[in-house]
Amino acid sequence: MNIKIATIITCFNRKDKTTSCLAHLFEATNNYNIQHSQLPIELAIFLTDDGCTDGTADAVKNICKGKNIHIIQGDGNCYWAGGMRLAWEEALKSKTDWDFYLLLNDDTLVSNE
């Protein structure tokens, strides 16, 4: 049995912050899974790229190779709330029975503790 978590993120031209956020999230998840192998976390990322022009989507794809990532393209007018709604809707469309939804700002650094 796994704990299924859909992580919802919106970004706009914050490539470094977004990739750092994801790197910390993956590291914390991996550390948790090592310590709790009987109940690991299955993580999926639903990220709205709201019209980024700084290469955020490519950087995210690069850091997320082999991960369950869904990038939704916004038109630049979603802002945070609209982008989160788009990502949430995409998570719902996946037909996965998520245990939790994690709404995460792209400048959040998840701790290993």
Identify the meaning behind each predicted range:
Residues T48-D58:
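A conserved acidic beta->alpha catalytic loop
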Residues G55, G82, D107-E113:
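Acidic donor-binding/catalytic loop of UDP-sugar-dependent glycosyltransferases
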Residues I5-K17, C21, A28, T48:
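A conserved hydrophobic helix/loop-capping motif in glycosyltransferases and polysaccharide synthases
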Residues H24-I41:
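Short, acidic, metal-binding catalytic loop of nucleotide-sugar glycosyltransferases
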Residues D97-L109:
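Short beta-strand-to-loop acidic/aromatic patch adjacent to the donor-nucleotide binding site
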Residues G74-K93:
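Glycine-rich, basic loop-to-helix element that forms the pyrophosphate-binding segment
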Residues D50, G74, L104-D106:
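Active-site acidic Asp-centered loop
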